Amino acid sequence: ALSHAVANEKPNVLFIAIDDLNDWVGFMGGHPQAVTPHMDALAKRGRNFTNAHCSVPVCTSSRVTVMSGIGPMTHGSYEIGPKYEQLPALAKAPTIQRHFKDNGYFTLSGGKMLHHDFKGRLTGDVDQSLGRKRSPRPKKPMSRPANWSGAWDWGAYPETDAQMGDIQLAETAAKALKEDFDKPFFMSVGFFRPHVPLFVPPKWFELYDEEKIALPKNPKTDLDDLPKNFLTINDYAVAPTHAQVVESGKQRSLTHAYLASVSFVDHCVGIVLDALKASSHADNTIIVLWSDHGFHLGEKQHWAKRTLWEESTRVPLLFAGPGIKPGKPCREPASLLDLYPTLVELCNLPKNPRLEGLSLVPQLNDPTAARDRPAITSSYFGNHSVRSRDWRLISYADGAKELYDHRVDSDEFRNLAKDPEHQAVIQRLAKWLPKKAAPEFKPKSERSRGRRK
């Protein structure tokens, strides 16, 4: 079995996070023109989890969940919200970095890992910082309409890769991989793109012919069979509405910028993977690549994240390294909550009893091994999605439901929740809906303001 293959010598871990990366990568087939050779090569030599989902479809809470191994129903962060160290439920919960450090690992981290970085009582979780540099932005808006949020801008900028924070991080990580360590290492590398603003150098835009870029299918009647509450949940004030994007005439240009940013970050991943391959650590390093949540580019007439639909919850998830045989993708439901327990088992560390995910080692050994629980995603308080191998059930706080059959409707165009013949499926999936939920935790600074609409 896999865990024994690496039991003699503790393997290193290269833990790569990418912000806002959806399935528009070659190895997931979400966009037919996506150019991602480095990640595709990684997928070929490891295990590609094609049905992996975040626990919360927004940066802060998703990352707190990954790093703690504890879900939102326990820690109480359901949106942008509080820092890891502010959550009372996580007061004694070690980050994955801390757990590895406490068990003999040297920890390095750079870029965006936790949304608010390793600060306060988390400062000591990381032995060596790889830095967290920002990329330059133009002084004036390049592409965004005047009535859009400032972050929603895009274009071919700056001139060279060397100016980009993600490239600087990749090169710092690559340099660190040349070193010899006197103990196994856990290296966390967090890339920012394709998070907005979608500025990357011109050469990444030149990979695509804007006029020929395929746009997502978007039937005008797509939202007609949805419960009314979905509108309030999915109204994400920071992002433009689909109507605004279409009216502005910018959909194709914005889609182009996202694809260019994905190809750029693939190059950054390649710099790190090439450095690992050339290093003395090549044969003894487990690689994990993941994104904190998905991203809509007009699908279901929505932009950005926070929804409980496939585009928001589904994430790339790859494992490769010693003992992980290349093979078929795994279609069983996986959750980002499963990363922490999987790595603990692969590296033969003592278990952290508070972890709420389930190890993916059985699926690393055999991609067809069944999993006995679906992936649960929650957005805001009281709204949940249950994603099994073939189905997605969404249940809103007011009791309204959506049901999609992914065997025939991967775009989630047809809501089956009201069909009499599907009530048994709903009942079966509804058993997984969280029964108890920690109240939403708001730090004192936010309580007076209430939720941003």
Q: Which residue stretches match the model-derived regions?
A:
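Formylglycine-dependent sulfatase
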Residues: A1-Y396, A400-K401, S410-K453
